[in-house]
Amino acid sequence: MLMKRALLLALAASTLAVTGCTTSVTDAADNRPSSATEGVTKYPVSLENCGKTYTFTETPKRVVVMNGGSVGEVSSLIALGVGDRVVANAQSYGASDVPDRAAAIDALPTGNITPNSLQDIPREAMLNQRPDLVISTGGGGFAADQGFATREELAAAGANTYVPRANCGVTGAVTGTPTIEDSYALLRDLGTILDVPGRADRLIADSQRAIAETAARVAGQPKKNVLLVFPGMGMGDSSDFSAIAAGGLWNDVIDKAGGVNPFNRDDGTTFVTISKEQLAVTPIDGLVVVNYRSPDIDAVAKRILAQFPQWNATKTNNYAVLADSIYLGPSNDVAVQRIAKLVHPEQFR
């Protein structure tokens, strides 16, 4: 249960940054090198990440993806069509809202690595992979006191390193308010690093277009209360309500879908435990349950609804199941559309 909780905490957010010398990408998500419109990266490209500068003289060919309780980074690599660069991947979610993605992730090489107690890649195993790029969900993935190879050790071995911008702290704590723009920044930056900036631009444009179309359908409609639940994921608690979404990228997703999270927090709190008494007096129009390796997630959703017959969501049996699209990654548009159809079905008939 502790490992499940750690997975959810790390999945909460991620983005990244880049600045530089020849071709450069800055901390501003909208700033891209001119080469992005040409569909290729002009090397060398220098990137500022978590206060340090990394220079790529060519596209990475031996990429290692650390676990960190995330799936957004490896999903972005798959979406960008550069999965063949991965020599060892430790990320896996077991389900996806995008057809064939979970299977594509499972098919990536793992490097035959025995993970440590944190279910991630220990120092010696990492160095033995001879990577030229290591991607970690947070700064903690390079913490020596956790048994990981440091960014300095990897640089000495010839590997650049990359951490999403908001997660540079050792604990991986999220800074600022995560939004879908963070997912676009991740795609844009990985596209630049891996010589597919044009492909990144197309993915971003497709997502923006899909979200705009969905948002237009629900524009002017009353905002509906959406409860986002991670069943059984609480710290040492198997309750359905011990891990309810508070602050996170998902609030931007819900907003663009014409909904609102009644338990939204802007103080950095990602999950909250809500009592049944409080839930009973909170009007809920749509229930979203997040599936992480559940044997019967539909039964879980129906069990939750049955406890609150007064909810509009219960009266209409109104729930949706999501997996990876609610987190940072390349497919937030999928979550936006599914939640919009959940709480504003009349706008999609």
Residue ranges and their predicted role:
Residues N49-G51, N112-P122, D266-K276:
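Short helix-initiation/N-cap motifs at beta->coil->alpha
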Residues D120-L133, F148, E152, T273-P283:
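Short helices/loops that flank or line small-molecule/ion binding pockets
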Residues D240-F271:
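Alpha-helical, coiled-coil/dimerization segments enriched in small aliphatic residues
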Residues G94-D97, G140-A149, A159-D189, Q221-L249, ...:
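Extracytoplasmic ligand-binding site segments that recognize negatively charged/polar headgroups
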Residues L2-S14, V18-S76, T192-F230, P283, ...:
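Bacterial Sec-exported substrate-binding components of ABC uptake systems
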Residues N67-Q129, L133-V134, G138-F142, P262:
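A short, structured surface patch at a secondary-structure boundary
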Residues T177-L186, D266, Q278, T282, ...:
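Structured C-terminal subdomain patch of bacterial secreted/periplasmic proteins
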Residues G69-E73, P122, Q146, T150, ...:
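Stable alpha-helical elements in mature extracytoplasmic
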